[in-house]
């Protein structure tokens, strides 16, 4: 026993085992007859009936669990025996705790605790000396935080504790030698880590120089999403935070938003002038036959006299420009009187407010001329009225009819032309599903049955019997249910291990009577049919004997649904082309026999035929469980089973997000995927946490001895099965969760013994049931803790369960006294709980420094470096997870109150395996948890066939992705902090490049792992078998985060250095280097050569920042491949739609313009006069939002909030940003700090931009940029310089048809300017505040001859866009316009003659002599000027498609603004409606 690696006190404990078993007074054992000496031998007369009842000892075995399972001899070595080591399962070597050894274990725990305290004291002393030796005095401020003060106070207490116990632990000399050895080892490790992190001694000194630099993460990476119904906070770990933290993305978004605003203005003016020239009724009469339309008795009910000639009616009386749902040809002479006879009938009888509520009439349907049925087919619309209300305003329709006609049912004039019966049958579902059951739409290829519940209408309330009868029809046959449950516990259970398998299966047997089918019990304890002929035996009755069985039924439905979705055949088919072979991982199908593969294929084909509809879960949670009431109102019926159902419900909502439109009752139209970023999950998790507190899960069950006393009562209650009334003296939680297990054990011991509490066998079974219940208790609590950490990491929100050990003493599931010899997979679950909790502690340490305001406000560089090094050691396998957690605690990065010291006796052999070992496990047949020892082939043959091993390895794979995503985030934060400092401190350039390279490496690693996952999910028996639904969103989210950093680097590689917002414009007007023919030819040739090199590119290799000019092309190829992936995944996963649109947006935006596309029409390819609005399905529509939506967008606020005010730098270009008036009004009068000019880390001497090649391009500049003549000053002002505004007004002013109320404060009203002033500042970008609801009634411009001549002399584009950027100089504020009582302006034509007689065309009268080809349209010049983003030539044609335009007013009508968020638009095939009041109306 001397060669054992375990502690020296263990052999003494093991040696006293056999001698102490029989005489220890503390052992709860019962010796069998004949086991003692002859003096204790039983009498001879006990040989008949009494000898049948044998008493078994409650002896805890000494051998490990694995050896007893394999039935081999165990050498009982600690921490793992030799047999387990040879077999390759040393990580599972587990010994049951001896009850008499608790005192000895406590002594061991004390020694281990003292050892950890000594290590922590030394680490704190080292940190304190480092701080004192630092020359910076500001670094000491960060130690004045409450946590740091408690840390040092704790160190003094620990030092006192160590000094008090040192003499009892060991001698002083031995302690001194041990400390010296540990100090030497730590110094060597620190030196090696520093050497690996820095290439030479100079870089090491540079790193040490900036170690105490402080970073403020509370301002750079915090977002607030302002929605129409509230706000959502998005922290530094959210995927949108990178858009705020990166300066290049911030400037790009500002440029894009400005472009979008300009383009929308052009769209509006074009549509306004098209209405101005065509004086038509807003009601489309094209559907009526010509003969019927010409009849005098069938005139339009709209009063055309309300309109001025050629003008659109006022908004409050004008129906929105859509097709009128009333067929105007169907009215006979007795229905609608002619307009001449009835002067009071001046309004359309259709209530057009219904349009704003969401009803869209059909576009192509032609109704019958004289039909009285509905002209609206509600079944063809995706947007129906929210209530069954007729769109015809009956008050306006029937007010002129006599009473006898109105009451006559035979008179056709008394009937509404809308068929109300069809409206009742096709009424839209309300936002809340309290009245109807949503209809199930099975996916393509589904073999789901047609259930009556999907075709019938349900009342507002269904009785329990009706719900159960409907569920019986929805559930699959009995044998299929048993197969689904078996598949779940074999493949999916490790992802959500909060159930007791035996207990749950017994509950299912009781509810569905699966044991009545001549069952044969399989290895899992589930009753299975003995013949395949019973395959189609349906569920005829559902028994719910207890209240908690409703929750068990809900869990069963989630399991059936989730398992069906997770079948490999249901996964999305991904074809990446030639790159697919790079992302393949070996599978284990070669190790399976042909018969096993055939049997597996038959089972999957059987399961595919039986899909459980999502409506079954809705019925159960709404009518049986009443989950909304339980989670929000009352906790009377909350028990352990209720918490389990809530966790399963939350898990299902995140995994199967496509069903959220049916399951959720909240309206999340503003989010593309309400299943992951929505705040509804935050509320649900908070409810789960509070229910756990209500049940007492935060306290360990060993603290409550009364749990042991409830078993006899529970057993008796279950034996008398059939009544829902529970014993009032029985704990309801135990009654609901342990009854089935007790019933099963009691039935095996006989009915007489089950009613007898004196039976020792029954006592033992009861004890086992108690331990299994406590085990489930602990598993649920730590799973909630893990959910809290994952949500905080995903959304960047603070954790709910902070400082866990301050209020919870629940032990890990490994503390449960359970014999796992019959359930090895539960042993793996227990090991995973311990490992995953330790990984969560590492994540908590990172989240504390990023999200906690007290730490994130002044976090230091060396703290982030320590976190990076420890996480790298963990994911690369160079350090055990126990050592990593200990290092975090010793360095003060993780407080002990988070639970770091909860596992002092953890298995060091069970750690996170290396990622290559996980992926290559099937190919090389390597030991996944090898401890470095070589194993022979004979040992491999003896290896135990472990259950759900592939699922466990898939979970390990996801943990690696999470850790490496944190490493990417930490390096990115440091990179963005030090990159702008390079211009002031050149020493930071080395640090910035190192952090950028590390961030790129981890970003590419996440990108590759995402591709590996989706490229292997359909492979049979692969690593990700049955994990396609559970891991799809986490993998795709990490891939999406990686692409954001790729975009940042592409911008740096193409744009070059930033010049700084306060120094000069980042948008150079008129730069045409990208349109020079010779330059274009050279760019095309370089692009072709680089594309040939990319064909040979290996996507599995890392990308080097020193790749030069090919860096952007290499990264672009990654983006294209990811776009291809998300496009294929969009067919199955809704959240892939948002990511596909985001990727497609940047791909289109950063695409290099080619010469062919620019010269197709002789240099006029950007002439968009005939250009039509593209289809939404072919463009990125997420930027199509109105003013209110844009101002709520966090990226918009951050992108445009830092722009310097106009006039601060007169040399700045007018395209640079918004005016002072608009900017300060939006941002509350505050300005974000300016962005400093600096060179990016990708900038090299060979990467110079061709910004100086402007000689020839300047000569070709259009005369639009030469200058303009100001009538007020008669001075030529260069086009690139904005005139200084007078009277404090900005050079950018509101449009002609609307003006800001800030200009009315002085009592002056602007007059109508001339066209010279209208076009004088066409290049200036107006702010969003120019769009107001104030309207000005102007005379009809079509009546003015000069105005008409100027229109004729312009191109269609010019006439449509000439008033897009109207400037109202202060000289025009002379009060020539008066406001009438209605709030509209009337032009005083008597004072100035004709108000529009002085209007001239742009550039004065010279325009009349110029042709349309000599003068380019405004939009073209605008796009040409703004296609240059800091040297990056953005393709204007793709920019129009990417940014999107002003939506056609004919499609307007909804007044509920969709919450705007970039790349978040649900309606990919429908137009996003604007709020009509935000755009002016021309009259």
From Swiss-Prot:
Q: Which residues hold Zn(2+) 2?
A: 64, 81, 84, 93
Looking up Gene3D superfamilies in the UniProt record yields: 1.20.5.170, Zn(2)-C6 fungal-type DNA-binding domain
HRM repeat segments = 280-285, 299-304, 323-328, 347-352, 389-394, 415-420, 1192-1197
Biased composition of type Low complexity is found at: 130-142, 177-208, 735-759
Q: Where in the cell is it found?
A: Nucleus
The residue ranges flagged as biased composition, category Polar residues, are: 1-50, 143-152, 160-176, 432-447, 706-734, 1388-1411
Return the GO cellular component terms, semicolon-separated: nucleus
Q: Name one GO molecular function term.
A: zinc ion binding
Residues spanning the membrane: none
The feature table lists the DNA-binding region at 64-93
Disordered: where is this region?
1-56, 126-208, 432-458, 706-767, 1384-1411
Q: Which GO terms describe its biological process?
A: DNA-templated transcription
Q: Which keywords does this chain's UniProt record carry?
A: Activator, Coiled coil, DNA-binding, Heme, Iron, Metal-binding, Nucleus, Repeat, Transcription, Transcription regulation, Zinc
User: Which residues are noted in the entry as Zn(2+) 1-binding?
Assistant: 64, 67, 74, 81
Print the miscellaneous field.
Heme is an effector molecule for CYP1/HAP1. The HRM repeat region mediates heme induction by masking the DNA-binding domain in the absence of inducer.
Record text on subunit structure and interactions: Binds DNA as a homodimer. Interacts with SRO9 and YDJ1. In the absence of heme, binds to at least four cellular proteins, including YDJ1 and SRO9, forming a high-molecular-weight complex (HMC) which results in repression of its activity and dictates its DNA-binding specificity.
Q: What does this protein do?
A: Regulation of oxygen dependent gene expression. It modulates the expression of Iso-1 (CYP1) and Iso-2 (CYP3) cytochrome c. In response to heme, promotes transcription of genes encoding functions required for respiration, controlling oxidative damage and repression of anaerobic genes. Binds to the sequence 5'-CGGNNNTNNCGG-3'. Is non-functional in terms of iso-1 cytochrome c expression in strain S288c and its derivatives.
What name is this protein filed under?
Answer: Heme-responsive zinc finger transcription factor HAP1
Query: In which organism is this protein found?
Result: Saccharomyces cerevisiae
The record's gene field reads HAP1
């Amino acid at each position: 026993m001397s060669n054992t690696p375990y502690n020296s006190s263990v052999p003494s404990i093991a040696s006293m085992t056999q001698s102490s078993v029989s005489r220890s007074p503390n052992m709860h054992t019962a010796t069998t007859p004949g086991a003692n000496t002859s003096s204790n031998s039983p009498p001879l007369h006990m040989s008949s009936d009494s000898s049948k009842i044998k008493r078994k000892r409650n002896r805890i075995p000494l051998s490990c669990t694995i050896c007893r399972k394999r039935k081999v001899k165990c050498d009982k070595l600690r921490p793992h025996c030799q047999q387990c080591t040879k077999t390759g399962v040393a990580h599972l070597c587990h010994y049951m705790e001896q009850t008499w050894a608790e005192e000895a274990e406590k002594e061991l725990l004390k020694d281990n605790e003292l050892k950890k305290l000594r290590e922590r004291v030394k680490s704190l002393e080292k940190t304190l000396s480092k701080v004192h030796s630092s020359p910076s005095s500001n670094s000491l401020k960060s130690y004045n935080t409450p946590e740091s003060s408690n840390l040092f106070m704790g160190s003094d207490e620990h030092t006192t504790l160590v000094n008090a116990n040192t003499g009892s632990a060991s001698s002083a000399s031995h302690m001194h030698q041990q400390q010296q050895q540990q100090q030497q080892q730590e110094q060597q490790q620190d030196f090696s880590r520093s050497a690996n992190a820095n290439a030479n001694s100079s870089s090491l000194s540079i790193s040490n120089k900036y170690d105490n630099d402080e970073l403020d993460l509370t301002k750079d990476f915090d977002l607030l999403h302002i929605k129409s119904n509230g706000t959502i906070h998005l922290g530094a770990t959210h995927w949108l935070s990178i858009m705020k933290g990166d300066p290049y993305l911030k400037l790009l978004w500002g440029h894009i938003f400005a472009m979008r605003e300009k383009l929308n203005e052009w769209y509006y003016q074009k549509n306004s002038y098209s209405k101005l020239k065509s004086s038509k009724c807003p009601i489309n009469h094209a559907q009526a036959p010509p003969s019927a339309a010409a009849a005098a008795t069938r005139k339009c009910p709209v009063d055309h006299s309300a309109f001025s000639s050629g003008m659109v009616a006022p908004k409050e009386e004008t129906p929105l420009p859509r097709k009128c749902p009333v067929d105007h040809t169907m009215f006979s002479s007795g229905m609608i009187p002619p307009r001449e006879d009835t002067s009071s009938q001046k309004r359309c009888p259709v209530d057009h407010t219904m349009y704003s509520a969401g009803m869209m009439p059909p576009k192509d349907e032609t109704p019958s001329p004289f039909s009285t049925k509905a002209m609206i087919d509600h079944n063809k619309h995706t947007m129906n009225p929210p209530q069954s209300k007729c769109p015809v305003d009956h008050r306006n329709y029937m007010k002129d009819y006599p009473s006898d006609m109105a009451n006559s049912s035979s008179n056709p004039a008394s009937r509404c032309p809308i068929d109300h019966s069809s409206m009742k049958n096709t009424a839209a579902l309300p936002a809340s599903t309290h009245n109807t059951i949503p209809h199930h739409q099975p996916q393509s290829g589904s073999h789901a049955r047609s259930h009556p519940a999907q075709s019938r209408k349900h009342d507002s309330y269904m009785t329990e019997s009706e719900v159960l009868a409907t569920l019986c029809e929805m559930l699959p046959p009995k044998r299929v249910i048993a197969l689904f449950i078996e598949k779940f516990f074999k493949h999916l259970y490790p992802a959500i291990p909060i159930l007791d398998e035996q207990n749950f299966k017994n509950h299912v047997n009781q509810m569905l009577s699966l044991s009545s089918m001549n069952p044969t019990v399989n290895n899992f304890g589930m009753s299975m049919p003995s013949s395949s002929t019973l395959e189609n035996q349906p569920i005829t009755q559902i028994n719910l004997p207890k209240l908690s069985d409703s929750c068990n039924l809900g869990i069963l439905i989630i399991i059936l649904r989730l398992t069906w979705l997770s079948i490999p055949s249901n996964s999305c088919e991904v074809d990446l082309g030639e790159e697919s072979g790079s992302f393949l991982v070996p599978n284990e199908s070669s190790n399976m026999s042909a018969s096993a593969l055939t049997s597996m294929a038959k089972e999957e084909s059987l399961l595919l035929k039986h899909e459980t509809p999502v409506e079954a879960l809705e019925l159960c949670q709404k009518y049986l469980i009443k989950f909304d009431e339980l989670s929000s109102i009352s906790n009377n019926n909350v028990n352990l089973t209720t918490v389990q159902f809530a966790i399963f419900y939350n898990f299902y909502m995140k995994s199967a997000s496509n069903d959220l439109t049916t399951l959720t009752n909240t309206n999340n139209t503003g989010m593309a995927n309400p299943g992951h970023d929505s705040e509804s999950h935050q509320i649900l998790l908070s409810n789960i946490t509070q229910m756990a507190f209500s049940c007492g899960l935060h306290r360990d069950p060993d603290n409550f001895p009364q749990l042991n006393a409830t078993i006899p009562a529970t057993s008796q209650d279950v034996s008398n099965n059939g009544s829902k009334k529970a014993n009032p003296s029985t704990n309801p939680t135990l009654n609901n969760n342990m009854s089935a297990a007790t019933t099963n054990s009691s039935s095996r011991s006989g009915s007489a013994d089950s009613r007898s509490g004196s039976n020792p066998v029954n006592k033992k079974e009861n004890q086992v049931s108690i331990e299994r219940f406590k085990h489930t208790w602990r598993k649920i609590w730590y799973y909630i803790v893990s959910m809290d950490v994952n949500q905080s990491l995903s959304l960047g929100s603070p954790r709910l369960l902070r400082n866990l050990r301050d209020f919870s003493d629940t032990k890990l599931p490994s503390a449960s006294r359970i014999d796992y010899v019959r359930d090895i997979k539960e042993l793996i679950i227990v090991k995973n709980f311990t490992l995953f909790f330790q990984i969560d502690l590492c994540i908590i340490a990172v989240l504390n420094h990023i999200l906690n305001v007290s730490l994130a406000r002044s976090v230091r560089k060396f703290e982030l470096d320590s976190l990076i090094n420890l996480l790298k050691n963990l994911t690369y396998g160079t350090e055990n997870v126990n050592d990593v957690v200990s290092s975090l605690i010793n360095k003060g990065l993780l407080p002990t109150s988070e639970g770091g010291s909860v596992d002092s006796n953890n298995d060091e052999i069970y750690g996170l395996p290396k990622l290559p070992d996980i992926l290559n496990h099937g190919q090389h047949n390597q030991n996944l948890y090898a401890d470095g020892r070589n194993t022979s082939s004979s040992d491999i043959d003896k290896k135990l066939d472990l259950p759900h091993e592939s699922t466990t390895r898939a979970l390990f794979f996801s943990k690696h992705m999470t850790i490496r995503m944190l490493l990417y985030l930490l390096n990115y934060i440091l990179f963005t902090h030090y990159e702008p400092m390079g211009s002031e401190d050149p020493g930071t350039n080395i640090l910035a490049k190192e952090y950028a390279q590390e961030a790129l490496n981890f970003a590419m690693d996440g990108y590759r792992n995402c591709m590996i996952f989706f490229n292997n999910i359909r492979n049979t028996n692969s690593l990700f078998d049955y994990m396609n639904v559970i891991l799809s969103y986490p993998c795709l989210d990490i891939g999406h985060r990686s692409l954001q950093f790729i975009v940042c680097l592409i911008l740096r590689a193409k744009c070059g250095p930033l010049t700084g917002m306060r120094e000069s414009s980042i948008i150079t007007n008129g730069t045409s280097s990208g349109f020079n023919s010779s330059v274009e030819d050279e760019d095309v040739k370089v692009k072709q050569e680089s594309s040939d090199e990319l064909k040979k590119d290996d996507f599995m290799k890392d990308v080097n920042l020193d790749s030069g000019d090919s860096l952007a092309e290499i990264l672009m190829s990654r983006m294209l491949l990811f776009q291809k992936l998300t496009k294929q995944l969009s067919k199955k996963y809704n959240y892939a739609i948002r990511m596909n649109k985001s990727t497609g947006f940047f791909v289109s935006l950063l695409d290099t313009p080619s010469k062919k596309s620019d010269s197709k029409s002789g240099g006029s390819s950007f002439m968009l006069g005939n250009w039509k609005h593209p289809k939404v399905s072919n463009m990125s529509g997420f930027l199509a939002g109105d003013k209110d939506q844009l101002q709520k967008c966090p990226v918009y606020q951050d992108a445009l909030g830092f722009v310097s005010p106009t006039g601060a730098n007169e040399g700045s270009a007018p395209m640079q940003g918004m005016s002072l008036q608009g900017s300060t009004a939006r941002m509350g009068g505050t300005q974000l700090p300016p962005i400093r000019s600096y060179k990016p880390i990708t900038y090299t001497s060979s990467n110079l931009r061709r910004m100086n090649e402007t000689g020839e391009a300047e000569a070709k500049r259009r005369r639009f940029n030469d200058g303009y003549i100001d009538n007020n000053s008669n001075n030529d002002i260069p086009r690139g310089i904005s005139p200084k505004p007078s009277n404090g007004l900005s050079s950018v002013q509101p449009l002609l048809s609307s003006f800001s109320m800030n200009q009315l404060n002085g009592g002056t009203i602007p007059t109508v300017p001339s066209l010279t002033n209208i076009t004088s500042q066409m290049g200036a970008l107006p702010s969003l505040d120019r769009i107001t609801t104030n309207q000005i009634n102007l005379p009809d411009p079509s009546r003015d001859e000069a105005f008409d001549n100027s229109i004729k002399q312009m191109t269609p584009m010019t006439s449509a866009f000439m008033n897009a950027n109207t400037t109202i100089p202060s000289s025009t504020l002379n009060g020539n316009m008066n406001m009438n009582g209605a709030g509209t302006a009337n032009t005083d034509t008597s004072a100035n003659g004709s108000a529009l007689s002085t209007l001239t065309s742009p550039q004065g009268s010279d325009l009349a002599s110029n042709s349309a080809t000599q003068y380019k349209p405004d939009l073209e010049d605008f796009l040409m000027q703004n296609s240059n983003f800091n040297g990056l030539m953005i393709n204007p044609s793709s920019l129009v498609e990417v940014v999107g335009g002003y939506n056609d007013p004919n499609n307007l009508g909804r007044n509920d603004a969709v919450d705007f968020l970039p790349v978040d638009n649900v309606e990919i095939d429908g137009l996003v409606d604007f709020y009509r009041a935000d755009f002016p109306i021309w009259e």
